[in-house]
């Protein structure tokens, strides 16, 4: 299980949301990975990403939750807790 946070350079929303996402994952001792969309075009295509920021939760090798552009942090925290 892990969280993937995708952002891009020059995205002010991405920079504002990043510490909030990190706080939630740290608080829940949840594995997380962060990637720059503009540096990983292949991953962007494989994950069907059309906007940033994007948060994707994976559990047992499958995507179980995705939020894009506007992240609901209470929903994200709830979804993470469901997998603990």
Where on the chain are the PLM-derived regions?
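Thiol-based oxidoreductase modules, predominantly thioredoxin-like and allied folds used
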Residues: 6-7, 25, 29-43
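Short alpha-helical
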Residues: 12-13, 39-42, 71
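CheY-like receiver
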Residues: 43-47, 79
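Active-site loop signature of alpha/beta-hydrolase-fold enzymes
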Residues: 40, 52, 64
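Non-catalytic, surface beta->alpha helical segment in thiol-disulfide oxidoreductase systems
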Residues: 57-84
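Structural micro-motif
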Residues: 47-56
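Local sequence-structure signature of Cys/Sec-based thiol-disulfide redox active-site neighborhoods
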Residues: 1-24
């Amino acid at each position: 299980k892990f969280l993937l946070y995708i952002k891009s350079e020059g995205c002010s929303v991405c920079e504002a949301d990043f510490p909030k996402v990190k706080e939630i994952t740290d608080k829940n001792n949840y594995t997380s990975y962060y990637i720059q969309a503009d540096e990983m075009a292949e991953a962007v295509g494989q994950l069907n990403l059309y906007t940033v920021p994007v948060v994707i939760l994976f559990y047992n090798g499958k995507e179980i939750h995705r939020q894009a552009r506007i992240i609901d942090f209470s929903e994200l925290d709830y979804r993470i807790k469901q997998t603990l």
